[in-house]
Design a protein with these regions (language model features):
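Phosphate-bearing ligand-interacting subdomains
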Residues: 1-51, 135
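Conserved mid-core alpha-helix of short-chain dehydrogenase/reductase
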Residues: 142, 184-188, 274
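Conserved residues in the N-terminal Rossmann fold of short-chain dehydrogenase/reductase
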Residues: 133-134, 176, 330
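Strand-loop microenvironment adjacent to phosphate/nucleotide-handling motifs in alpha/beta enzyme folds
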Residues: 64, 69-73, 191, 221, ...
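Proline-aspartate-enriched helix->loop->beta-strand connector
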Residues: 1-3, 101-102, 147-156, 164, ...
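Conserved Rossmann-fold NAD(P)-dependent oxidoreductase catalytic core, especially the SDR/UDP-sugar
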Residues: 26, 41-42, 157, 161-220, ...
Length: 432
């Protein structure tokens, strides 16, 4: 037997995935027929047979969304998406555009990303009132001028630095962009009467071991603080890895294989949750419909995936033989990296919503006066490019634990830096 064809279009994603995992253990080539939806909507023939993709092994059944509830709060509204050119932000723009907003505003610091999604939406939705603006959420005057001019009803705040190892080496940038970019955008939303503010958060905010996760936890704390005193409904949506996003492992593995390998995995036991970008964004929109203010919505990410198994499957599906013409190299955990991620703390618990894939985590109590006081110290430390911002962060986020090896690494970098001498830095308060 040389080839296996899975020709059960009526099978759900889980059944298909389980069958493919068994078949993948053989040496046979694997092909699948399109699903039932394609049979109904398209002419399907043997020519439609395709190779099995890694997405077939990661996928889940179609996510059920209450379209009426999403339509009810997006249609006819002015919607601002910060970071609108990024992986999550651009998909937010795509899906919001389908619901006939009064005006959609793409706001991003990277002009090429913003231009790409602008051109895509102009072609697909020629009647859409679309504004594409370049600017930084770190710039108070810029973000406030946008809010004042366009008076958005809804803000999806997706602008953030998300790369864990890079932020470990540039912690002050994570603080400036993530923490105070969120603070300034949220403050502007409150000032100019935004009705709904949805923060895109991450599972790395739970018991963080890296500055990126700690910064996103502070973002959650910021919007929870605003929600207590503002007429704006401030909420956060927390989810794990999305495959296909900038910097995700699947594109990296494919590039490594195209270059002849090896495929690099940090640890044989590291696991992650995965969801497609469209799945995550559709649930973000649904969570926004449920929002009353102050909630942290947690998305059901499905079953965790061992990254080593993901690499092995991708090697197999790409036509290589592990150990013969493609190798896996284990490189060790990177600074700030965890073996596994958590979607919520034990204290947060879970409350169900109408959608079985969306839960609400119980907000953790914290001293808001102390929090705001520490934020001021953190702001000044980031402006001064100090090396102790991680320690200041750990005083603000009690669940943030810096790994000992990372402390030693940071200390060594600091000692070397001091030998070179430190140039003074003066500039406006985070108005870049």
């Amino acid at each position: 037997m040389d080839e296996i064809v899975l020709a059960i279009p009526s099978a759900g994603t889980k059944v298909t995935r389980d069958i493919l995992r068994i078949c993948n253990q053989t040496e046979c080539k694997l092909k699948v027929l399109p699903g039932m939806y394609q049979f109904i909507t398209e002419e399907v023939s043997v020519s439609k047979l395709r190779e099995v993709s890694i997405e077939d092994l990661l996928g889940r059944d179609a996510i059920d969304i209450d379209l009426d509830s999403v339509l009810g709060y997006v249609k006819g509204k002015t919607v601002l998406v910060t970071g609108g050119g990024g992986s999550i932000g651009s998909e937010l723009c795509r899906q919001v555009a389908k619901y006939n907003p009064k005006c959609l505003i793409i706001f991003d610091i990277y002009e090429n990303n913003a231009y790409d999604i602008q051109q895509e939406l102009k072609k697909k939705y020629p009647m859409l009132h679309l504004e594409t603006l370049i600017g930084s959420v770190r710039n108070t005057k810029r973000i406030e001028s946008v809010m004042e001019l366009y008076r958005p009803d809804i803000v999806y705040h997706a602008a953030a630095h998300k790369h864990v190892p890079l932020m470990e080496d540039s912690p002050n940038e994570a603080i400036k962009n993530n923490v105070f970019g969120t603070y300034k955008t949220a403050r502007a939303a409150d000032k100019y009467g935004v009705k709904k503010f949805v923060l895109i958060s991450t599972d790395k905010a739970v018991n963080p071991t890296n500055i990126m996760g700690a910064s996103k936890r502070m973002c959650e704390m910021i919007i929870q603080t605003f929600s207590r005193y503002s007429n704006t409904e401030f909420v956060a949506v927390r989810f794990g890895n999305v495959h296909g996003s900038n910097g995700s492992v699947i594109p990296l593995f494919k590039k490594q294989m195209a270059a002849g390998g090896p495929v690099t995995v940090t640890h044989p036991d590291i696991i992650r949750y995965f969801m497609t970008i469209p799945e995550a964004v559709s649930l973000v929109l649904q969570a926004g419909a449920y929002a009353k203010g102050g909630e942290i919505f947690v998305l059901d990410m499905g079953e965790p995936v061992k990254i080593a198994d993901l690499a092995k499957n991708l090697i197999r599906l790409s036509g290589y033989t592990l150990g013969v013409d493609m190798e896996i190299k284990y490189t060790g955990l990177r600074p700030g990296e965890k073996l596994y991620e958590e979607l919520l703390t034990k204290e947060e618990g879970l409350q169900k919503t109408e959608n079985e894939l969306i839960y609400i985590g119980k907000p953790l109590e914290f001293d808001e006066v102390h929090f705001l006081s520490e934020l001021r110290k953190l702001e000044q430390a980031a402006i001064d490019e100090r090396f102790d911002v991680k320690e200041i962060d750990s005083g603000i986020v009690p669940t943030y634990h810096i790994r000992e090896e990372d402390k030693e690494r940071d200390s060594a970098i600091y000692q070397e830096f001091c030998k070179l001498g430190r140039a003074s830095h003066e500039g406006p308060v985070m108005e870049e």
